[in-house]
Amino acid sequence: MGDMANNSVVYGGVKNSLKEANHDGDFGITLAAVRALMELRSTDALRKILESYGDVYGICTKLKTSPNEGLRGNPADLERREAVFGKNFIPPKKPKTFLQLVWEALQDVTLIILEIAAIVSLGLSFYQPPEGDNALCGEVSVGEEEGEGETGWIEGAAILLSVVCVVLVTAFNDWSKEKQFRGLQSRIEQEQKFTVIRGGQVIQIPVSDITVGDIAQVKYGDLLPADGILIQGNDLKIDESSLTGESDHVKKSLDKDPLLLSGTHVMEGSGRMVVTAVGVNSQTGIIFTLLGAGGEEEEKKDEKKKEKKNKKQDGAIENRNKAKAQDGEPMEMQPLKSEEGGDGDEKDKKKANLPKKEKSVLQGKLTKLAVQIGKAGLLMSAITVIILVLYFLIDTFWVQKRPWLAECTPIYIQYFVKFFIIGVTVLVVAVPEGLPLPVTISLAYSVNEMMKDNNLVRHLDACETMGNATAICSDKTGTLTMNRMAVVQAYINEKHYKKVPEPEPYPPNILSYLVTGISVNCAYTSKILPPEEEGGLPRIVGNKTECALLGPLLDLKQDYQDVRNEIPEEALYKVYTFQSVRKSMSTVLKNSDGSFRIFSKGASEIILKKCFKILSANGEAKVFRPRDRDDIVKTVIEPMASEGLRTICLAFRDFPAGEPEPEWDNENDIVTGLTCIAVVGIEDPGRPEVADAIKKCQRAGITVEVVTGDNINTARAIATKCGILHPGEDFLCLEGKDFNRRIRNEKGEIEQESIDKIWPKLRVLARSSPTDKHTLVKGIIDSTVSEQRQVVAVTGDGTNDGPALKKADGGFAMGIAGTDVAKEASDIILTDDNFTSIVKAVMWGRNVYDSISKFLQFQLTVNVVAVIVAFTGACITQDSPLKAVQMLWVNLIMDTLASLALATEPPTESLLLGKPYGRNKPLISRTMMKNILGHAFYQLVVVFTLLLAGEKFFDIDSGRNAPLHAPPSEHYTIVFNIFVLMQLFNEINARKIHGERNVFEGIFNNAIFCTIVLGTFVVQIIIVQFAGKPFSCSELSVEQWLWSIFLGMGTLLWGQLISTIPTSRLKFQKEVVHGTQKREIGEEELAEDVEEIVHAERELRRWQILWFRGLNRIQTQIRVVNAFRSSLYEGLEKPESRSSIHNFMTHPEFRIEDSEPHIPLIDDTDAEDDAPTKRNSSPPPSPNKNNNLVDSGIHLTIEMNKSATSSSPGSPLHSLETSL
């Protein structure tokens, strides 16, 4: 280190000459030489530097840069450097072209089948049998108009055209989705900045603007954006596992290993480096180039294999690429990482497994549901074709006794092709291949909108996961507080000052220790700069806590910069950088007489324990006994902490010149025997909006826990101010040590049972390390206390928070205070570091789930009706009332347009009124099932009435049993038109899935929805009135259109009728059918009242009086139920009372088979609640998510009272009884 300081001084003389020579001649080092140098490691690199350049300063000279003042920042010079050494940009993988996306969309099996059938139909339609054989070949319409009989080709052509439309829309969707993701990626890249020195000024520039010759400042937590050589370093340790696979941190120093490589993480320390290679010429870029070239060759070789795997892997690769590219790392780096060895494998396995994680819970559920429905659809379509073929053969050759004529064979084949097309049509509608599509659309929409709410989403699935969040482990500083720190109290000079005093009271030596200790023992990157505008606040650069300590020096009329100029960073002998584990920072100075002095600062309790002396009022050091320390803790530190202040102790120690030099690597022996200078209290005011956000979380069933490194009293005070803690509540506040003592056994191993006893009541974990945070997060996730697995979100800003951020279901990194390592490990970056943004993320997550449920409710209704109509119509009339082209149009409405309309609904505050859905919540709630079956019933009645009697009602010709190639009939056109309009109006019904009556509420807030509904209606008019034969439609009169609209609007009125049917009534009837009449009539009435209260509270605030009536009735019912508790318990003890048919109905058919816990497709949980095996488990969430009281209290009371569970303190039942 001493040599380094000397080098700096020597170099100072040539600094000015370099500035002048900055643009003269070429650089003294070539790009190839730099690349060759950076490929060497440790001693080899050091030897090469010494032999070829003398030292790192020689390299600086060759690169025409100053190690102290950096580049001058001249635009022409920067451009020349980019031209010679390249730009710091690694080009991403080329996006798929629109034609490639079209080709992928064409791979859909059902579309391929339809294309083949359409081509066969098209070919055969041009064959005409001899005139005389027409009668012998069966009913083939020749038509009265000229050319009428020759229009058979139109259906085949129209099917092909429709397939082209579907393919183009699908490809456009994929293209726009990819474009959105790339926009997000570029946004994240723009957010990435790095600190460099240019023209002697420390500035932050975008990573892409860094060029060779820049002097970059590296610090704890940074992700290095380019290759470089160390100029000066303090205790610098790098994690190079991303490049080498070695898990051990590599110590960097000028005399051992000075090379710093791009894509690696700074785990400890700080320093400066000269940038030597950027972009594709850096080590990361070289690997990317190799992988990119290899990848292209592989693509050419394995194109066929890849095509088969495309569907499975596309989304995963895209998400993985996005995740990697966001961090400035090449997309193709991932395979190399996961193939390397070492402990780094575990991290990389996590990343390599990301694609599995990216296929989110919801997407997985939808895919399974689509497969199951698809199987049913395949069966239905096969049966349809078989019935049609048999019907034709029996009718033609058995009943009519026609002979098989060779010349009629093409006609018969045309019939069979027609039947086949009908079967495929049933399959096309039945198979909801677009079911996972709304997830992608909704997530993409949400991700873009969440940016406006200060949530930068890195991993798509995190958006949906947050909707299920049950616990949030939040940092205190910056998240719950404003991170605007200032020293407001101090214990110094043996006095407790409630405000920072004038400099006069201090003895000169105390002031000297204070000024020097703070100036050199804070990172030199932490500065307080003058305000940009006159009268404004000073600008704070660097660490907020350190800037808070620098502030009082200015108040004391002392200039820390003078001290730093006198003792430059290069002159610091040894630095023990701040770590969340040690919770302190220490700096060693070497004096001119050969003695050493160490300054320490850190958490007051930790530093005070290492203090053996304290500076007295007259400035002399006196003995500091344990009881003196206890007095300071009680009289100074605890009062400060109880006011929410962070307490920091400042201390020093001298090492005399005559003694042997200490072993500096043995930190424990160095940082002890200190002399206390002062204890300061730093105020970090709480964010005023956080209390309301936490209230929303609690109402939404989310537990908020503070996990901080601060003093327990400080943490408790802030938690109380924010509303996390309430006086008189039975919650835990623990310190890290106490937490570990409680959860570990004698061998020091963590016991899950012990964690399960603590976490439900834990609200504050203070003086915690990142390991404690990881342990808590893992413990909550692995907990089996509740029936549903807990979904945990965690915030983090430090490098060591990485494991906790990765382990959590939703990892939030701080955008302002967070390190690059924390950001890389996170799922979402909070660009404003504010807790309220997490609550918005929860709201968006729940909105995704609701959007998918809306789409599901809509699509399944269409599926049920279309399949039954096509199947039954084909069997009865030997033809499908809905033609293939019409079905494709319906399919387009169902899949793509409805996805866009329903998956882009903006969220509302009401989403935070219910409990989390839980990972195992069925996709289809009872309310949704009621709506699906109810609307399907209405639509089927209307369609079949029109099908069988429509011609009499409208006084038109019947379209049933029409011959082959017959012109379109008005009859079937009306059926098609009314069917589509019913779907269109039902799309409005589908906007509400919790039984709300006002389906139009907020409809105009969603411009996309309004545009799609109106657009679909206009296209339907065009199809019916002008498309004619291609869509098998005949023009309709105004009266017929009015009837169509009236019957379509009937779904809205029918929806109101369905809403009046209580879901609880349906549940009760279902239980009667299953033979489980255990529910008291009073309880059933109570459930109805609760349902009414839900609607009243949600929609008509003036009916709040119902709450009071309802609560009175609930109180009465609780007493009644309590009275019958024991008798109910006896009744439940007999498992034989459950019939085998009930077990059969409630298990296999309603479950999705998977390695995960069984997730029923339909919410059938309430029918099982009475099972003795579930007597002691908490019931699943109510389908109605918009009412907190119902979910947390009333429903639980009914079920738990029946089950004879005791209302333990802290349980939902206990809290309800207490509130009543």
UniProtKB/Swiss-Prot annotation:
Per the database entry, which stretches of residues form a coiled coil? none
- Catalytic site: D475
- May I ask which residue range the UniProt record assigns to the signal sequence? none
- Composition skew (Basic and acidic residues), residue ranges: 312-327, 337-356
| Compartment annotation | Cell membrane; Basolateral cell membrane; Synapse; Presynaptic cell membrane
Renumbered to this chain, the Polar residues biased-composition regions fall at 1200-1220
- According to its record, what is known about the domains? Isoforms A and C contain and additional calmodulin-binding subdomain B which is different in the different splice variants and shows pH dependent calmodulin binding properties.
Q: What is this protein called?
A: Plasma membrane calcium-transporting ATPase 1
Gene (name only) = ATP2B1
